[in-house]
């Protein structure tokens, strides 16, 4: 088997694994009524999704660093096996508490599947080829977003909600087999140090922070006792983040090497990624609310109205992958930022009488901007460092993105009049959403500014090649 065929097999395995991890974030949503109907525990509804995302976020930087130390293949297989074990156990869960714990296990494995594939692509392909392949890989997230609720609904209607977890097993096993038999790595034999104090302090800090954000977003966060718990969690989070930073500065193999942030490309890419993901989560969560609460349309219609974004995002990812080696990082970033600014201004001026064609245009531009910008930044981060730091670099960028989404949905949630869309007066809801979209437009201006200051990626890659 020649090298090109081997590389194709590895790439297929990575695409499959990425799709499985991505779709698990959305496929459960349509199955939740059936799950709560059988297992009861409606009050724990939100934790089925939240615990998966929380576990994934916490383990992302850990897998990134361990893949630099022990190899991509080893850590990918370990993560995939944990993910499949969590999937199988979720399928046999008999109580809501069991399902929550098994979803947490699934998320612990998903941290590897959302990070290491991008790192392996960075290892296998040259800069020009890498951009195209990562563009296709980024489009998988958009495809998963579209197909997740659809697949979930079909499996629940025709088989069982348990099938949404069992379906991961055959595809996951194929991905593990293809990668384990095709990927070859030459690791330098040396004593390796695992930063256990860093892992522990980071895990505690992130768990407390994300749990506090979850309480703030949910109705559980109302009341004096809940407010006290939120303050306590945030205080613990700050203390352990400070401890984590001190440990990392002294560690010979830090989980998040601070030297990464001295690299201007990575520093600017992380700032841009954070802002983009704050905006991204607002668009995804609050546009459907506008459709239901202001336009007075049913939930099904709001899902259909988001299709332009779901189509434009993969399209933007593919275009970014094909253009970045020709046009450059700054060109793609600025183009994406301009589309985002135009769409966010459009959203901030919408009314109940805004024609559907304009709403579709704004939504399409938003999706195109996310595809162009986020994909080009992924390519930039994986290309800006050498092999021994690539896992940590990609993982840190993924972590920054999730942090942006978490903070975005929490802060903008506080600006919104709480309640369900059918119980809020359309004029009141429109006013709250206009405030949110106004601040999204302001943030979009900062995205444009950061994009204009983005370094030239080709020069950095060439310098890296010369150094090696």
Predicted region positions:
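Central cavity-lining transmembrane alpha-helices of secondary-active solute carriers
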Residues: 50-64, 114-118, 307-320
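Extracellular/periplasmic helix-loop-helix junction of adjacent transmembrane segments
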Residues: 31-58, 300-304
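Interfacial helix-cap and linker-helix signal at transmembrane-aqueous boundaries
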Residues: 35-36, 66-67, 151-159, 213, ...
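12-transmembrane solute porter fold
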Residues: 10-23, 28-30, 49, 81, ...
């Amino acid at each position: 088997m020649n090298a090109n065929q081997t590389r194709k097999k590895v790439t297929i395995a990575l695409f499959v694994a990425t799709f499985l991890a991505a779709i698990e974030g959305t496929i459960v949503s349509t199955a939740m009524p059936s799950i709560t109907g059988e297992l009861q525990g409606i009050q724990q509804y939100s934790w089925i999704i939240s615990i998966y995302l929380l576990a994934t976020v916490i383990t992302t930087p850990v897998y990134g660093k361990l893949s630099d130390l022990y190899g991509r293949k080893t850590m990918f297989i370990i993560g995939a096996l944990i993910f499949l074990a969590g999937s199988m156990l979720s399928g046999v869960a008999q109580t809501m508490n069991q399902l929550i714990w098994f979803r947490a296990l699934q998320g612990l494995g998903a941290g590897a599947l959302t990070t290491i594939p991008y790192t392996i692509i960075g290892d296998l392909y040259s800069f020009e080829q890498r951009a195209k392949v990562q563009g296709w890989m980024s489009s998988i997230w958009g495809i998963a977003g579209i197909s997740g609720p659809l697949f979930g609904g079909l499996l629940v209607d025709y088989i069982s909600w348990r099938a949404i977890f069992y379906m991961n097993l055959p595809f996951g096993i194929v991905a593990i087999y293809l990668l384990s038999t095709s990927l070859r790595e030459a690791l330098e034999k040396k004593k390796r140090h695992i930063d256990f104090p860093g892992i522990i302090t980071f895990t505690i800090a992130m768990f407390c922070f994300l749990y506090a954000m979850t309480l703030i977003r949910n109705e559980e966060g109302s009341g004096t006792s809940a407010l006290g718990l939120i303050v306590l969690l945030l205080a613990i989070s700050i203390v352990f983040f400070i401890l984590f930073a001190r440990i990392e500065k002294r560690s010979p193999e830090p989980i998040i090497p601070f030297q990464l942030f001295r690299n201007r490309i990575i520093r600017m890419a992380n700032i841009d990624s954070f802002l983009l993901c704050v905006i991204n989560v607002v668009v995804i969560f609050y546009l459907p609310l506008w459709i239901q609460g202001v336009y007075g349309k049913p939930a099904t219609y709001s899902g259909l109205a988001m299709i332009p974004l779901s189509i434009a995002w993969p399209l933007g990812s593919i275009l970014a992958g094909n253009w970045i080696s020709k046009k450059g990082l700054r060109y793609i970033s600025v183009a994406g930022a301009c589309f985002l600014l135009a769409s966010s201004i459009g959203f901030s001026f919408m009314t109940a009488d805004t024609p559907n064609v304009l709403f579709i245009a704004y939504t399409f531009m938003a999706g195109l901007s996310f595809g162009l910008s986020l994909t080009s930044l992924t390519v930039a981060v994986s290309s800006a460092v050498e092999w021994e730091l690539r896992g940590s670099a990609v993982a840190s960028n993924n972590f920054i993105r999730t942090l942006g989404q978490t903070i975005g949905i929490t802060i903008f949630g506080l600006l919104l009049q709480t309640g369900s869309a059918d119980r809020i007066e359309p004029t009141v809801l429109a006013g709250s959403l206009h405030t949110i979209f106004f601040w999204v437009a302001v943030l979009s201006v900062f995205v444009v500014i950061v994009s204009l200051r983005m370094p030239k990626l080709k020069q950095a890659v060439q310098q890296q090649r010369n150094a090696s």
